[in-house]
Amino acid sequence: MKVASFIANRIAFNRQRSFSRFIIRLSIVATVISVAVMIVTLAFTNGFQETVSQKVFSFWGHIRVQYKQPMKSSIAEEEQIEKNDTITQAIRQKAVVVSIHPFATKYAILRTKEEMEGVLMKGLDSSYNFDHLKQFMKQGRWLRFSDTTYSREIIISSYTAGELKLKLNDKVVIYFIKPDGSLRPDKLAIVGIYKTGIEDYDKTFAIGDLKLIQRLNGWKPNQIGGYEIFIKDYHDMQKISDDLYYNIENFPSTWDTRTIKDLYPNIFDWLSMQDVTRDVLIGFMIVVAIINLITCLIILVLERIRMVGVLKALGARNWTVQRIFLQHSTIITCVGIILGTAFGIGICWLQQSTGFIKLKEEAYYMSEAAVKIVWWQVALVCSGTLLISFLVLMIPSFIVRRVRPVKAIQFR
């Protein structure tokens, strides 16, 4: 074993009581807290962003194909387009596409004897994969469709049910606004109640049969409001949207492709802001860990100043003496990183298992904090903390170079 490593290990694992021993423990605790907070911050931010994003995508898909209306609001009714089997088949053949479904929306008013509530009815057909919405269903079942007529069933949000004092299997009168401005009443049975936790959705949407909307609008069976497309990786949304628009042969010039990020920018801009908070907190934790380690190293050098003088008097080079304290500090850092990683992952596991951290769903779109551990991020936190600490600790270690052996040996 090299001299520097031997002495560093003897100092590090020396059980003799001293002031530096207290400082070492304090530095380890600070490193543990810093590493744990960084891991927890990353895991909670990842979980939060993914959970909210997946809720948005599950309700609306990742990409919409509809009539080209650049200034159209995300909750406005669509202009009709005609189904095009050639285009939809070309989209389905894309390896990145999971499914494609027709839809249309129409404003309506739900009314009971005491209350009324405006909704935007989202019409779907029997080809729709209910698995996308299954996670949101709190009560009831999916719509049952008929081959000959439209379904007289509706799914409403728990918010709407609460406002109108409705429950599962109740009949509700619904008024649709026809193209000529007149109201057309109908009576539908509530077969399901959903809750996404996203206020914009829960206060706005009800789900019904696409055929009903076609009939109300006077559309033909092959006329729809658009298509919603689900893809494998939401990170590729924009690229896939552009690919569909520009590269599919005979793509209608009156059609447009828009990502859900384009339609709901406020939600995704808010999610992006979490990255700033995450980065600031991680940066602060790194600074805290480094300051504690620098303080610890300076105290270690000052406490062992006579040892430094003796080693230099015996002919030890400055770099050899520096390495003793650098390796000692590295041992302290490694202990802190290992314990901090275990502590941070433990908190994440506990949250996944028990959900002990609760959130206000109206504000955060979820009732408890979501966690997603990305292991390469954990590895980056550990290796980055170790590397940055080592490089920064090089600076105070240069104190050793200024020590004069004669004065250091006389130091008490």
Question: What are the roles of these predicted feature ranges?
Answer:
Residues 1-9, 130-131, 258-260, 350-364:
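Peri-membrane helix termini and adjoining interfacial loops of integral membrane proteins
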Residues 14-25, 233-291, 300-302:
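Peri-transmembrane interface segments
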Residues 338-381, 394-398, 402:
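Short helix-loop junctions at transmembrane helix boundaries
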Residues 398-412:
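Short cytosolic juxtamembrane segments of multi-pass membrane proteins
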Residues 49-83:
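Membrane-interface junction motifs in transport/secretion proteins
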Residues 298, 305-351:
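Transmembrane alpha-helical interface segments in multi-pass membrane proteins
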Residues 20-46, 272-307, 330-339, 387-391:
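Hydrophobic alpha-helical transmembrane segments of multi-pass inner-membrane transport and secretion
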Residues 80-221:
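A structural signal for hydrophobic secondary-structure junctions
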